[in-house]
C-alpha cells in the first residue's frame, strides 16, 4: 500500500500527483509534497456520492445525471475543494460498465483541461457544501441481492447499476443466479 511505500513515491520527486479510483487514504506527506498538488478524479458530481462506488449508486438510485469532479486531495475521503466538474446524463439503457467507460473518457478530457489551469495558477478552488454531502460506500453482498418486493424500476436500476460486475443476484431453486440485464415489460405477469 502507499502508506507503507510512500518514500518510493517521494523519491520520484513528482510535481503533481493525480489519482483516480484509488480507494485508499493518501498520507499527508504525499499530499503535501508535489509543487502543484495532489488531485483526484472522482466519478460523481461532488459533494454527492463521496466514496468508492459513486457510479453504482447513481444508477441504483435511478439518477438521471452524474458526472466527473476533479478536486484537491485531502486527508478526508473525497472532501477536497472542487477544481472542475462536468456533468452527463445517464441513459436509460445503460449499465455500470457502459457508464463507467463514458465517464472515464469524460474524466480524461476534464483532466486535460484542468492541469494547465493548475500549472498556470488560474484554477479556481470551490469548497464543497457539507450540507449536501451524500455517501456512496462500496456495495455490500446484501445490497447486491435482489428483493422482488421492491418496485420494478428499483430492481431494474439495481441490475443495471451492478452489471456486469459485481452483479445483482437472486436465488432460483436454491441456486444463486446473477442478473446482467433487465427489461421492463408493460405486461403484468403472475408469479411468486
Task: Label each PLM-derived region with a short phrase.
Residues 1-166, 175:
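One-carbon transfer enzymes
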Residues 157-192:
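C-terminal accessory region of SF2 helicases/translocases
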Amino acid at each position: 500500500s502507499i502508506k507503507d511505500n510512500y518514500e518510493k513515491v517521494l523519491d520520484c520527486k513528482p510535481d503533481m500527483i493525480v489519482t483516480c479510483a484509488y480507494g485508499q487514504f493518501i498520507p499527508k506527506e504525499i499530499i503535501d509534497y508535489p509543487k502543484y498538488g495532489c488531485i483526484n478524479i472522482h466519478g460523481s458530481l461532488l459533494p454527492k456520492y463521496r466514496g468508492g462506488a459513486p457510479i453504482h449508486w447513481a444508477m441504483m438510485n435511478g439518477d438521471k445525471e452524474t458526472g466527473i469532479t476533479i478536486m484537491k486531495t485531502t486527508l478526508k475521503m473525497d472532501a477536497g475543494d472542487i477544481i472542475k466538474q462536468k456533468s452527463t446524463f445517464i441513459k436509460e439503457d445503460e449499465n455500470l460498465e457502459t457508464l463507467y467507460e463514458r465517464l472515464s473518457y469524460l474524466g480524461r478530457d476534464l483532466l486535460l483541461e484542468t492541469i494547465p489551469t493548475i500549472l498556470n495558477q488560474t484554477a479556481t478552488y470551490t469548497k464543497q457544501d457539507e450540507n449536501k454531502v451524500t455517501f456512496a460506500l462500496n456495495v455490500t453482498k446484501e445490497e447486491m441481492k435482489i428483493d422482488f418486493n421492491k418496485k420494478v424500476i428499483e430492481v431494474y436500476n439495481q441490475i443495471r447499476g451492478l452489471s456486469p460486475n459485481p452483479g445483482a443476484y437472486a436465488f432460483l431453486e436454491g441456486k444463486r443466479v446473477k442478473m446482467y440485464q433487465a427489461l421492463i415489460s408493460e405486461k403484468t405477469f403472475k408469479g411468486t
